[in-house]
């Protein structure tokens, strides 16, 4: 329980690491898009990073006994203004940076790869904490609504991150 309390206290502080990624390479806000984004399972699979990603390992026997940063990949609304609502904002650097900082400043063991999941992914329920960026223009598909509802009612945590201003 102490680890969970510490984690919940540190997340607001570490969320700044996500915001710090806003003006990395590519378009402002880290909006560069690569086709690999649609099929990647981890942030490390993407061939492009603004800085070399940090590397660390965990003991092999504890591969499933770690915190895993899990980003939700979703459709972009066709009605959104340019750049609004894209799930890949600050990806992959923010995922790797937050995971590294959690590993660095807490006693948590953190998966160095993180995950990218769709809400319909059967593995969703293996991750108690999921991250969704730019939900201001979120439009869930009919099949995603009951899955997300069940995930949340079963104790899953959704962090919704939106830095675009008051209009959202």
Ranges and model annotations:
Residues 1-2:
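N-terminal secretory signal peptides that target proteins for export/translocation
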Residues 19-20, 145:
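Alpha-helix boundary/interfacial micro-motifs
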Residues 20-129, 133-136:
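Aromatic-Pro/Gly-enriched surface loop or interdomain linker
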Residues 69, 129-168:
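Short alpha-beta junction capping motif
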């Amino acid at each position: 329980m102490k680890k969970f309390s510490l984690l919940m206290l540190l997340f607001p502080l570490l969320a700044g690491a996500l915001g710090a990624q806003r003006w990395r390479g590519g378009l402002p806000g880290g909006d560069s898009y690569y086709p690999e984004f649609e099929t990647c399972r981890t942030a490390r699979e993407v061939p492009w990073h603004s800085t070399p990603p940090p590397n660390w390992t965990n003991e092999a026997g504890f591969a499933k006994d770690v915190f895993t940063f899990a980003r939700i990949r979703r459709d972009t609304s066709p009605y959104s203004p340019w750049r609004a609502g894209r799930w890949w904002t600050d990806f992959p650097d923010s995922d790797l940076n937050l995971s590294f900082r959690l590993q660095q400043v807490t006693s948590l063991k953190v998966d160095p790869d993180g995950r990218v999941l769709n809400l319909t992914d059967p593995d969703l329920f293996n991750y108690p904490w999921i991250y969704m960026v730019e939900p201001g223009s979120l439009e869930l598909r009919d099949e995603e609504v009951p899955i997300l509802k069940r995930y949340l009612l079963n104790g899953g945590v959704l962090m919704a991150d939106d830095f675009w201003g008051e209009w959202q």
